[in-house]
């Protein structure tokens, strides 16, 4: 039977349509393969970063790049036993209102609602399901487009806020929501691992790093400096000891001594940067690594800590306790010095501070200007 011209056109149209469907299917599968490869790279990238602040920053950049949003922010607990999810100081694309409350209790209805969701929800979906109290309104004031729960081991460890999408459509497709869920899952596992590391490397009383972890970080930094081949970056060490600490324990009791340790640790933390590392060295001794800090700058930091402790009145059981500290300072001299050596020099300088009357800062002789 002869094929009519109309039938030929119809067959051609069907063939063209089938080709387009086939091409669209191939494109979609190629995109899925590409996205899976991206998720693998994201997993490798996040699992290679254990330091919490750097990890949060990495997650935010990844989220904004992969999901094409104009903003991203993360709410996490400050510690495992905390009852609040707090907005991390690193966030992008959101206008922060000074008087707004950017923290939320773990028992809040919003948290319970997010916990039941896997791929997240929009502000409209939240408004329809829970009462929008002041806390929720403060979060909505940031104009987020999407809330994403962060879950690790069936436990919610925080949530992610996404800003506006770069593209014209403000709604995430089901496919995009699946990508969001996968990225959130990887981010949650990385955050959980980072928090576990924080727990195992942090002194419970002072919330400073433990001695063994401090030395690990110090050796890593020295290796980085020596590997660069350029003498552009250095570091300095502070060894700090509370003067007459035994007398405090004998006079006021060990509970008072613990309070003194906590307060001195807080001062050390407040006088140093996030890039620096403070640790409890043992007993009433502390150690600080000041990154990219010269000997003269380290002396200024040490003096600031010493003066702050001297001026602080620590209250215990209605009594004021005034303490002083002695500090030794050493700075790396680019001579392939070991971690042990630079710490020993700071310790010797601390001993000199003790011998010369306490409540003072002494620089290691190796770092003194040559005559």
From Swiss-Prot:
Pfam family, one: GGDEF
EC identifiers of the protein: 2.7.7.65
Entry GO terms, CC: cytoplasm; plasma membrane
Keywords in alphabetical order: Allosteric enzyme, Cytoplasm, GTP-binding, Magnesium, Manganese, Metal-binding, Nucleotide-binding, Transferase
Subcellular location(s) of the protein: Cytoplasm
Designated gene of the protein: dgcA
Annotated organism of origin: Treponema denticola (strain ATCC 35405 / DSM 14222 / CIP 103919 / JCM 8153 / KCTC 15104)
Protein name: Diguanylate cyclase A
Biological-process GO terms, alphabetical: cell adhesion involved in single-species biofilm formation; negative regulation of bacterial-type flagellum-dependent cell motility
Single GO term (MF): metal ion binding
PANTHER family tied to this protein: DIGUANYLATE CYCLASE DGCM-RELATED, REGULATORY COMPONENTS OF SENSORY TRANSDUCTION SYSTEM
Subunit comment: Exists as a homodimer and as larger aggregates. Both dimers and aggregates possess DGC activity.
UniProt: Mg(2+) binding residues: 241-242, 284
Record-annotated site: Transition state stabilizer: 246
Residues at the catalytic site: 284
Domain GGDEF: 233-366
InterPro entries: Dguan_cyc_DgcA, Diguanylate_Cyclase, GAF-like_dom_sf, GGDEF_dom, Nucleotide_cyclase, Rev_trsase/Diguanyl_cyclase
Signal peptide start-end: none
Gene3D superfamilies named in the record: 3.30.450.40, 3.30.70.270
Reaction catalyzed: 2 GTP = 3',3'-c-di-GMP + 2 diphosphate
């Amino acid at each position: 039977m002869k094929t009519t011209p109309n039938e030929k056109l119809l067959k051609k149209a069907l063939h063209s349509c089938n080709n387009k469907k086939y091409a669209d299917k191939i494109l979609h599968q190629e995109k899925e393969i590409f996205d899976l490869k991206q998720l693998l790279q994201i997993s490798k990238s996040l699992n290679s970063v254990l330091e919490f602040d750097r990890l949060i920053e990495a997650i935010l950049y990844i989220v904004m790049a992969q999901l094409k949003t104009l903003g991203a922010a993360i709410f996490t607990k400050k510690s495992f036993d905390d009852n609040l999810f707090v907005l991390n100081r690193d966030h992008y694309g959101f206008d922060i209102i000074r008087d707004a409350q950017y923290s939320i209790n773990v028992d809040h209805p919003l948290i319970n609602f997010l916990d039941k969701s896997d791929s997240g929800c929009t502000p409209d979906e939240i408004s329809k399901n829970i009462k929008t109290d002041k806390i929720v309104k403060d979060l909505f004031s940031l104009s987020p487009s999407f809330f994403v729960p962060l879950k690790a081991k069936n436990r919610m460890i925080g949530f992610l806020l996404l800003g506006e999408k770069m593209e014209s459509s403000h709604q995430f497709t089901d496919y995009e929501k699946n990508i969001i869920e996968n990225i959130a899952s990887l981010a949650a596992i990385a955050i959980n691992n980072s928090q576990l590391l924080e727990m195992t490397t942090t002194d419970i009383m002072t919330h400073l790093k433990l001695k063994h972890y401090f030395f690990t970080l110090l050796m890593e930094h020295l290796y980085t400096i020596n590997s660069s081949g350029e003498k552009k970056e250095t570091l300095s060490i502070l060894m700090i000891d509370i003067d007459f600490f035994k007398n405090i324990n004998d006079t006021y009791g060990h509970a008072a001594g613990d309070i003194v340790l906590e307060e001195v640790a807080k001062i050390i933390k407040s006088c140093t940067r996030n890039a620096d590392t403070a640790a409890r060295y043992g007993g009433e001794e502390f150690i600080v690594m000041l990154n990219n800090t010269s000997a003269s700058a380290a002396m200024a930091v040490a003096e600031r800590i010493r003066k702050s402790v001297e001026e602080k009145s620590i209250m215990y059981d209605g009594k004021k306790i005034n303490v002083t500290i002695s500090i030794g300072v050493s700075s790396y001299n680019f001579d392939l010095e070991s971690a042990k050596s630079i710490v020993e020099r700071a310790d010797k300088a601390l001993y000199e501070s003790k011998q010369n009357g306490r409540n003072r800062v002494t620089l290691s002789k190796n770092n003194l200007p040559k005559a």
